[in-house]
C-alpha cells in the first residue's frame, strides 16, 4: 500500500498546476511539513511539488572540515548506525534486509566476511532531498535499489 501511495504522490507532484493553484499547494506543503525555506527560493517559485521537493540550495553550505567530522551526504535523521558482521540484517523503513540483499553483487567478495559500517538516514518530506559529497570525487559506479 505504501508503494501505491508513493506512486500516486509522485504522479500528482509532477503536475504543473496553474500558477495561483501551484503557489497555494506549495505554501500548504511548506507550512504543513514545517519546512525551513531560509536556504531556498520562495515556495511560489517552484512550478510543481516535485520541483519544490527536489529544490536546490541558494548557496553552498558550510561544513566542518576537521578530519574527525562525519559529514552526512544528506539532510535527515540518523535512525541507526552500526557495524554489520558477516552481512547481517539492518532495518530500512521497518523491514529487515541483509546487506547482500540491499547491495547485491556490488559488494566485493573480499568484503563479504568483513565488518561493514553503515548509517541509515531517514529523509522526511520536510528534508532537503539532494545528496552532496564534502570533497572532490568521481563516482565510479552507482546502484539503484528499488523499494517496495
Segments (PLM) and residue ranges:
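Non-catalytic terminal segments and appended small domains
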Residues: 1-148
